[in-house]
């Protein structure tokens, strides 16, 4: 669709997690949150704009780790580690710009938010589900806490690029610029 620029409002920057929550006036189909525990070896699908360009990434769950985000906070943060499996389109280099993008399971539910990468090791780190729920709860907006899922998506290792394209076209996944 046409490119639009909208200012975010009701911005909430988490002091505890490398996450932020905000609203825009535009509307897009909402994704739901997975309630089942993550399982080692499960598939995940990351959608966003690495290097400023649309892309979809397939990864496989390795486990939990703690990182120091090194930004505003000096604490360690629990995150989920994923082994990168495939990029579409195929490109090399950084995933910078993917941060903040949703990570979905095979049922199209949110299981994380991309936070940082370890390029040398082929790892992607995402926020832990508890961190997402904590950030949403602290935002005070009931729409974040119990979203009304309106988007139903089935994703697999072959179809995920077209699913990502559809999510970007519907603006369920959008490029966000922070300054």
Regions found by a protein language model. Give the residues of each.
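N-terminal activation segment of mature serine protease catalytic domains
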Residues: 1, 150-179
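Conserved active-site neighborhood of the chymotrypsin/trypsin-like protease fold
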Residues: 1-56, 93, 142-159
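Conserved beta-strand residues within beta-sheet cores
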Residues: 7, 43, 58, 100, ...
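Solvent-exposed, polar/charged alpha-helical surfaces in well-ordered, non-transmembrane soluble domains
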Residues: 31, 39-45, 130, 134, ...
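Short, flexible beta-strand-to-coil junctions
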Residues: 47-51, 106, 117-119, 177-179
């Amino acid at each position: 669709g046409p490119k639009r620029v909208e200012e975010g409002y009701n911005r909430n920057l988490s002091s505890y997690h490398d996450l932020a929550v905000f609203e825009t006036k535009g509307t897009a189909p909402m994704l739901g949150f997975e309630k089942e525990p993550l399982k080692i070896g499960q598939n995940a699908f990351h959608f966003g704009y690495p290097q400023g360009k649309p892309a979809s990434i397939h990864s496989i769950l390795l486990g939990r780790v703690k990182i120091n985000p090194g930004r505003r906070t000096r604490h360690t943060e629990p995150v989920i580690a994923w082994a990168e499996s495939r990029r579409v389109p195929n490109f090399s280099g950084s995933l910078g710009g993917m941060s903040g993008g949703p990570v979905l399971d095979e049922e199209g539910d949110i299981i994380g938010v991309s936070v940082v990468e370890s390029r040398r090791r082929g790892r992607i780190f995402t926020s832990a589900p508890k961190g997402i729920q904590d950030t949403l709860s602290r935002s005070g907006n009931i729409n974040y806490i119990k979203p009304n899922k309106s988007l139903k998506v089935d994703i697999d290792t072959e179809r995920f690029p077209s699913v990502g394209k559809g999510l970007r076209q519907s603006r369920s996944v959008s490029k966000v610029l922070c300054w």
